[in-house]
Amino acid sequence: MSKDQIIEAIKEMTVLELNDLVKAIEEEFGVTAAAPVAVAGGAAAEGGAAEKTEFDVVLESAGGSKINVIKVVREITGLGLKEAKALVDGAPAPIKEGVAKEEAEEMKAKLEEAGASVELK
């Protein structure tokens, strides 16, 4: 299979399929797709005391009422039932990335009200 064929196959995948692919690659090769902490720390130090304006809403766990959390995830993301369930089952997982502070806090409140454990990054 050529590099171009692999890229074409990846283009046709859904977000959840890509997430599964990344996890499989991480397990197979013993690597991680996470950015090194030193790079993130350096970027934060350069920014000084500037307030963060964009946040990532990360679902840490669904808690006891998984069904309610799935409903809220569907409402927030617009995903289908299967995709929302896979996202909740795959926690910790980002729900939305690069959202304004106010919107991120609203999402966090909705998810926590449904019983989820959520972190803003």
UniProtKB/Swiss-Prot annotation:
Domain of life, source organism: Bacteria
A GO biological-process term: translation
Pfam families recorded: Ribosomal_L12, Ribosomal_L12_N
Keyword Ribosomal protein among UniProt keywords: yes
GO cellular component, one term: cytosolic large ribosomal subunit
A GO molecular-function descriptor: mRNA binding
Gene3D superfamilies assigned to the protein according to its UniProt record, in alphabetical order: 3.30.1390.10, Single helix bin
Keyword vocabulary terms for this entry: Ribonucleoprotein, Ribosomal protein
Family: Belongs to the bacterial ribosomal protein bL12 family.
Job of this protein: Forms part of the ribosomal stalk which helps the ribosome interact with GTP-bound translation factors. Is thus essential for accurate translation.
Subunit description: Homodimer. Part of the ribosomal stalk of the 50S ribosomal subunit. Forms a multimeric L10(L12)X complex, where L10 forms an elongated spine to which 2 to 4 L12 dimers bind in a sequential fashion. Binds GTP-bound translation factors.
Protein name: Large ribosomal subunit protein bL12
Protein source organism: Halalkalibacterium halodurans (strain ATCC BAA-125 / DSM 18197 / FERM 7344 / JCM 9153 / C-125)
